[in-house]
């Protein structure tokens, strides 16, 4: 059985998790945090989450894992058959991750962990993120899914990344930068009504609450 390593608060972990759930693939979850420990680096050379264990062998990087899952478990496809449409799904994922989530991540310290982002950082992020939101709005079809009529890996990515972009910008800037893309809110509501997304989100919330309680207990 496949084993997914990571923790339920991680959006990249949850991207893979919800894909596995949507495809009906049996898997185990192995709790672990990011680490530079030598033993852990044998599983994930950059020390990140998630990783996937396959019969004692390991893969890292969420998109690589998704590609492997699709190649080995094609029964419930999360990529279209047409080559161009498959590329469009990957295009959306790239915009979501490189031009939105990783840009907004520079705000997470202030938004979620009690840190402070410099005025220069906030200014740069706001400018770069506006471009990412514009690109996503242009490319996403919302008919009803991001890439068209069928659920795809683009939705697995959007469902875990967009809420973080939304919340972090609302906290730091006092406005949700995803408001510039009106279809996003009903789209996310639609995704979150799916059993796989609901299960992933329920377990994410439980893990978030547990981490907050543990932190409060420490002091």
Name each region found by the language model.
Residues 1-131, 143-146, 217-218:
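GST-like domain detector, emphasizing the conserved glutathione-binding G-site
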Residues 29, 149, 200-201:
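A generic structural-conservation signal
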Residues 88-91, 186, 199:
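Short, solvent-exposed alpha-helical surface patches in well-structured domains
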Residues 96-193:
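GST-like fold's C-terminal all-alpha helical module
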Residues 105-106, 201-204:
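Short coil/turn segments at secondary-structure boundaries
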Residues 194-195, 200:
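A late-sequence structural motif
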Residues 204-219:
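Acidic/histidine-enriched, glycine/proline-rich intrinsically disordered or flexible terminal extensions
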């Amino acid at each position: 059985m496949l084993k997914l390593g990571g923790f339920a608060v991680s959006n990249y972990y949850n991207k893979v998790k919800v894909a596995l759930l949507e495809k009906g693939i049996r898997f185990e979850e192995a709790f672990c945090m990011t680490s530079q420990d030598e033993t852990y680096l044998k599983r994930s050379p950059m020390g990140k989450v998630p990783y996937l264990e396959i019969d004692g062998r390991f893969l890292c990087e969420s998109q690589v894992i998704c590609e492997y899952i699709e190649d080995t478990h094609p029964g419930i496809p999360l990529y279209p058959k047409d080559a161009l449409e498959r590329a469009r799904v990957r295009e959306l994922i790239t915009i979501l991750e490189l031009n939105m989530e990783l840009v907004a991540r520079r705000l997470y310290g202030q938004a979620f962990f009690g840190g402070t982002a410099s005025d220069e950082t906030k200014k740069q992020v706001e400018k770069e993120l506006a471009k990412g939101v514009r690109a996503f709005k242009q490319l996403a079809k919302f008919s009803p899914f991001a890439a068209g009529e069928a659920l795809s890996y683009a939705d697995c990515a959007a469902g875990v990344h967009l809420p973080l972009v939304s919340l972090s910008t609302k906290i730091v800037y006092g406005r949700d930068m995803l408001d510039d893309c009106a279809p996003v809110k009903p789209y996310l509501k639609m995704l979150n009504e799916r059993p796989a997304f609901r299960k992933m989100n329920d377990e994410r919330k439980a893990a978030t609450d547990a981490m907050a309680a543990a932190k409060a207990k420490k002091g």
